[in-house]
């Protein structure tokens, strides 16, 4: 991963979702711990399973050719199960360079959602040489069991050389191949949705207290959790100036939902003055 200064837990992150203008003063500690763009991009690709594969068209004089594909992550890189009859497969046989665009699904402004474009070269893989390919892919796409053993279907892996990550407005950067290789998906990504729903449905009062006592949003009237990761969580705090983004860091990294619960409880107690 990128070199860090001594004492820096992780690099400063971009502005969380919810800020109306980039000129507004941030109402939280700008040095709060958060995941890197490499980690966020890895997490996004693990969460999703469909994407747009762009190959170089052999038929149309090198024009980019976009195809809808399903994928799974194998050893940190996406694999596809595609037929030799498909146009994108013919393109890859002639030119291995390709890109894969993975987009986050969700409500609201689609441009505020995350997406990442992975660039690299595709390599044809042997089903017989590595049985784990089939296992990993079918775990993600069980319906593919019908055709996974057909002779005209093969696995291809996109070996990522770099990636362009956009996490929404104000969050974007290039992620190098080595940073991609050395990062990991966030361990909370599978449980994040349930944690967020639970906090918003049952513990808004606790989040309001945290905003008032642990950020500059002293006039917070309501708060909604918008994201959570191993390092902390983000909220949209309703203030007199409208919704404002707030990020609060955990004292310790949370590797599962139970650890995240304990960290949130500790923050609530601290905000209330119980500790």
Where do the protein language model's features map onto the residues?
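Binding-site signature for planar aromatic cofactors or substrates
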Residues: 1-275
């Amino acid at each position: 991963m990128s070199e860090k200064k001594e004492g820096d837990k992780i690099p400063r992150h971009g502005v969380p979702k919810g800020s109306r203008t980039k000129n507004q003063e941030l109402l939280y500690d700008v040095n709060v711990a958060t995941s890197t763009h490499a980690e966020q991009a890895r997490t996004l690709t693990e969460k999703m399973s469909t994407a747009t594969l762009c190959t170089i068209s052999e038929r149309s004089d090198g024009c980019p050719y976009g195809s809808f594909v399903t994928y799974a992550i194998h050893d940190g890189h996406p694999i596809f199960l595609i037929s030799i009859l498909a146009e994108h497969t013919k393109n890859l046989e002639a030119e291995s360079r390709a890109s894969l665009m993975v987009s986050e699904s969700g409500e609201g402004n689609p441009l505020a959602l995350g997406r990442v474009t992975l660039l690299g070269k595709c390599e044809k893989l042997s089903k017989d040489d590595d049985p784990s390919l089939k296992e990993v892919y079918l775990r993600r796409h069980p319906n593919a069991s019908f055709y996974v053993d057909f002779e005209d279907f093969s696995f291809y892996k996109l070996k990522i050389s770099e990636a362009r990550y956009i996490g929404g407005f104000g969050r974007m950067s290039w992620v190098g191949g080595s940073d991609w290789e050395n990062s990991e998906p966030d361990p909370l990504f599978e449980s994040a949705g349930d944690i967020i729903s639970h906090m918003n449905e049952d513990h808004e009062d606790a989040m309001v207290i945290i905003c008032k006592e642990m950020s500059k949003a002293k006039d917070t009237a309501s708060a909604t959790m918008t994201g959570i990761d191993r390092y902390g969580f983000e909220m949209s705090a309703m203030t007199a100036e409208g919704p404002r983004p707030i990020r609060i860091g955990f004292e310790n990294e949370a590797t599962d939902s139970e650890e995240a619960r304990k960290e949130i409880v500790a923050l609530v107690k601290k905000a209330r003055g119980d500790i």
